[in-house]
Amino acid sequence: MPNSDAGLVSVLMSVYNGAPTLEKAAASVLTQTYRDLELILCDDASTDDTWRIMQRIAAQDARATIFQNKTNLGLGASLNECLARAQGAYIARQDADDVSDSDRIERTMDFLLSSGAPYAACGVRVFDDTGVWSTRQFPQKITKHIIAQKNPFFHPTMLFRRAVLESVNGYSTSPETRRTEDYDLVMRLAANGVIGENLQEILYSVYEPQEAYLRHNARTRMYEVRVRARGLRAMGSPASDYIYLVKPFIMACVPRGMMRSVKRLQWKLQSRDTKK
């Protein structure tokens, strides 16, 4: 039987112009085998039918709570607003264009409780309009050295003990973290000695169309350098780990038309390294 007596899980979802995929994403949460959950939906000032769809979802399932931002606040601030409304002792994530496997929350919760980890994530399969084109996993055990290289947790799969998330006051709302809210959070937690673990199962499907790689520009890459540098200092990382600050500079120089090929090669190498 699903471990529903472990406690209420609040699933946070911030949506901006997510009308085409929102219902499917929400349904993948509300049909979980783990039944003791609620879905907190934030419409981050969308200009499409997102709010109307949210109203329909809430009318059909009392476990869905919905609200609107008057202006577009961005992911970090919107998730903090979701957290303020959440009732659960555990906090999970979900993105509006992704799909959770039906047992994702149950299996991740079981792993979280059995491992004693402060938070947990799982592996993902990556799809676009042509179908699944990649799978990704990170090692179960994570160190500060690994975090210095990259964010080793897939943000929309993360499940936190609420106290862990609140110990660092949730997500940063700084403009510098607008594309790196998750990495910033992981680094701030690691600076406090709090590092999660990865369940070695693929339980989540991430939608990544080719245009997803165009969201980062030179400015966001420079912001990423600042976030990384601040995180390295906070974690007390050795000087040798600062070499990884070069990565955002390199990515900023890659022609946009080549980005997907570069990312695919990166994920292939990452998958090979993970299996070692």
Predicted regions and their residues:
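Acidic helix N-cap motif at the loop->helix transition within catalytic regions
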Residues: 21-23, 48-56, 99, 103
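Short, acidic, metal-binding catalytic loop of nucleotide-sugar glycosyltransferases
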Residues: 27-36
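A conserved acidic beta->alpha catalytic loop
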Residues: 43-52, 71, 95
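Acidic donor-diphosphate engagement hotspot in glycosyltransferases and nucleotidyltransferases
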Residues: 50, 78-79, 100-105, 130-131
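Glycine-rich, basic loop-to-helix element that forms the pyrophosphate-binding segment
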Residues: 69-86, 107
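Short aromatic/hydrophobic "clamp" motif used to bind/position activated sugar donors
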Residues: 91
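Conserved donor NDP-sugar-binding/catalytic core segment of glycosyltransferases
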Residues: 103-134
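Conserved nucleotide-sugar donor-binding catalytic segment
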Residues: 142-219
